[in-house]
Amino acid sequence: MSGFRVIVIDDERIVGQMIKAAMEPDGYKVETFLNAEPAFARLREEKFDVVITDLKMKGIDGMDVLRTIKTAYPEIKVIMITAFASLDSAVEAMKSKVDGFFAKPVKIKDLKECVQKLLNRADTTAG
């Protein structure tokens, strides 16, 4: 798993910290952001494999993050997490090609399994 790069965008600092603390011991390189603008700047600077984003945030929300990334960086896997999960938001995310969708509170074990499966699938289709 070593070397995969992950961005977490969530306006709740503790969420990013928890995901980072859970994933880095497994070899992931995780960077956290409280909003989308600096995360987009970072994506322009370096290659990342996965973006985990909150749905409801001030400014650019998770749906806009999803659409922007899928347009500019279609190879990046996007996982959405939200405290406001609804059938409508899940359907909208699926239509926008989200790779994973989780309601908060997220079970870290499930999130890590999703990331691993997405990256394993990407490895087999790339090679």
Language model region names:
Residues 16, 58, 86:
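The feature encodes the CheY-like receiver
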Residues 13-31:
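Two-component/phosphorelay signaling modules centered on CheY-like receiver
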Residues 106-116:
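C-terminal output helix
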Residues 32-50:
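Acidic, metal-coordinating helix/loop segments flanking the phosphotransfer/catalytic sites
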